[in-house]
Amino acid sequence: MNNPDDNDIAAEYLALKAANDELRERGKQWLWNALDVICSEINRELSARNNPPLQVGRQEWQFKVEDSTMVGERFGARFREKTLVVEAGWPREPQHGFVPDRGLARARIGFSQNVMLEAKIIAEFTLKRQRDNDPAWYAIENKKLDARVTEPRLREYFNLILGD
């Protein structure tokens, strides 16, 4: 027999999932927009000094956080032989698990000194819902929530690939 309360629970779940997915997409878009702005600024600076531009690209990607699979995208920026990688995503299916620390999504930054080497993870972020219901990325330091991620903070990671 069909219980009317089951329909209410399903409707509430679907509404919450839709609201969270919208926040996740907004958070991911903020991250990609910030990286695009930073890369444009850096390329203008490099061009003014007659240096080659950053090589950038983005692709669909999956990565593991603890026992969960985050499904999303990976952004890469390369200058000469050094590479900076930014991964962002969240579980899409029940078998993917959940976002640790009650976050909406996770992101990681990796750095490689050589194009032949896998990027080593140097930073992790979690996307959280704010009191005003806007999403914001926060750094995770020693498995604890740290400072909010800003464009200037993201820009600092690019110094790793721009330095000698």
Where are the regions that the model predicts?
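Contiguous, amphipathic alpha-helical segments that mediate oligomerization or scaffolding
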Residues: 2-60
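Intrinsic disorder/low-complexity polar-acidic segments
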Residues: 65-164
